[in-house]
Each structure stands twice: as structure tokens, then as C-alpha cells.
Amino acid sequence: MRLLSLLTFSLFAVIGLAPAAQAKDKLTIYTYDSFVSEWGPGPKVKENFEKECDCEVNFVASADGVALLNRLKLEGSKTAADIVLGLDTNLTTEARASGFFAPSGIDQTNVKVPGNFKDDIFVPYDYGYFAVVYDSEKLPNPPKSLKELVEGDPAQKIVLQDPRTATPGLGMLLWMKSVYGDEAGAAWQKLQKRVLTVTPGWSEAYGLFTKGEAPMVLSYTTSPAYHMVVEKTNRYKALAYPEGNYLQIELAAQTTTGAKNPLAKKFLAFMTGPGFQDVIPETNWMFPAGKTSKPLPAAFDALPKPEKTLLIPPYEVAKNRRLWVNEWLAATSR
């Protein structure tokens, strides 16, 4: 029998009919580039979830959250995305109206974010506050308020992100609108004198900053924690402004395509627990939105705490985003 089995196997191998290993189920996640970088949360999240699901996770990266939504709109119902990870509350109304997202169907009891944001489609996975981050060795006297940033020395440059492609850029746009209202256009004209460049996403902007191209960058109050934990330096600092800092809550959702893949719902549930949440503080350098199994790194205790939280309702952002982007374009192109 052994000989017969061996001969049978050999025959199948020769004619290319040898039994193949069963292909694993796949989950495709669209996200932003820093999430999937070697130092981002992507690799560890992928490892943890694949152990749990015995599946294959494929990340597809775009520049940032706004670009993710733009891409999904272009692809429509033909998208390969099961999950889109990297939107934020500023995009939820527009994203819902697209019709490309499906209810999560998961228990969100473990999810806790400022303002108690809850949604049947969009699930929070982390949050943070936009802030000016500066190099204390190059800028010993940074702007102590948004007003000082807008009206300060044009020689002290800042790197910003494009609100048309990057959620931090959109966050800055809404921050300016929250503080300056109808005078935002005039404020942008003043601030433009300090802007070294505007990048498509966060990664490019922060890279220019750490390379010394500018002493300031738009980032998060939590960004200095990376330098404290990984580089063992307090050189880079964030600023909490008296006018308030704009809140960002990052979200993930399953697409209508993903709703047909059982792994999508399973991933969203996994995302609210320690297998995902424990990875966030020291890779995405944001506050976790779900259940963790350990406390935050001690460096987070040293971070500035915003005196006031700013957040424009999603429906108002959706109604006015194009108008406000055009206002920014008109002001900064003069």
C-alpha cells in the first residue's frame, strides 16, 4: 500500500495535480501610510489578528484619511477594501452619504473617547489632539497661542498638511475656523508667511521636521512621547493653546463589500480589544479608544493637556468643507 500511495503521489506531482495547501481567507484593509510603516501599528496588528483568525491580512496604503475616502469614492462598489481604517469624525457624514459603508454590528461597550462618540457604522480606535510640535533646540521661544502662531515671526517656519488629502490638514483647517470664524481667511493669509511647505500626508511633514527643515510641524500633543520613549530625548515638545486644541477621533468601518466577508466584522470587534489597543500608544502614538491590558507609557503623563477641546459637528463639516477648503486655497495662494 505504501508503494501504491507513493506511486500515486508521484503521478499527481508529475502531472501537476498534487494536492495544494488550502488557501487562507483574506481581509483587505485600506489605511494610511504611517499605519503600515515598519514603525507603525500595522505589522503588530496584522500579526496579532492573523494568529486569532488564521487568515491573511493585506494592507493597502494611501497618503492619509481624506485620500482614503477619495479613493473609495473613485473605486465605488468595485473596491477591494473590506475595511477602511483611518477616517475621522470630520469625514463621517460624507462617508455615510457615499453609501459604501455598512453597519459594524459589533458591541462597542469597550470604546471610550472624549465626547462619547458612538456610531453604528464607524468604530473609534484611537484619539488625540492636534498641536504644534516644535524643536526646543532650534526654537527656545515657540508661539504660546494660536494667535502668536498666526501673527509671529515669518522666519520661524512650520510644515503643514493639505486638508484635501490629510486628516491633520483638515484638522488644522477646522481648528482655524473654530477659533477665527469668519476671519479665518485673513488669519490664513498671515499664517501663510510662516508655512515652509504643505505636504500630502502626515509622514512627509513630520519627516521634514525631524530632518531639521523647519522648527515646527502640525502634529499631535502625543507626538513627543515617541521621542521620549524611543530616542530618550525631551528635545521635541507639543503646545496646548489657550484657544483650545482640535480633537481627532480616528475610525474604521467595513465597506458594503466587506460586509460579505465575515473577517471584516471579526476585525472590527478585535480592534476594540487589547490585541489592537495595546499596540496603539507606542506605535501610532495616540490615546487608545478601547480596552487595553496595560497602562499607558509613563511618557504620556508628561504630555501637555489641552485647556479646551475643539470639535465641529460632522454634519457641519460635511456641509462646509468644500467652502472652507476654497477659502484656504484663496488665502494661501495670494
Curated annotation (Swiss-Prot):
Swiss-Prot/TrEMBL keywords: Periplasm, Signal, Transport
Signal peptide from the UniProt entry: 1-23
Record-level Gene Ontology MF annotations: thiamine binding; thiamine pyrophosphate binding
Chief location: periplasm
One record GO biological process: thiamine transport
Binding site for thiamine: D64, G65, A166, T167, W202, Y220, T221, T222, S223
CC per GO annotation: outer membrane-bounded periplasmic space
Domain of life from the UniProt record: Bacteria
Subcellular location: Periplasm
Family matches, as Pfam families: SBP_bac_1
InterPro entries tied to this protein: SBP, ThiB, ThiB-like
Function text: Part of the ABC transporter complex ThiBPQ involved in thiamine import.
Subunit structure: The complex is composed of two ATP-binding proteins (ThiQ), two transmembrane proteins (ThiP) and a solute-binding protein (ThiB).
Record-stated family: Belongs to the bacterial solute-binding protein 1 family.
The protein's name in its UniProt record: Thiamine-binding periplasmic protein
Organism annotation: Brucella melitensis biotype 1 (strain ATCC 23456 / CCUG 17765 / NCTC 10094 / 16M)
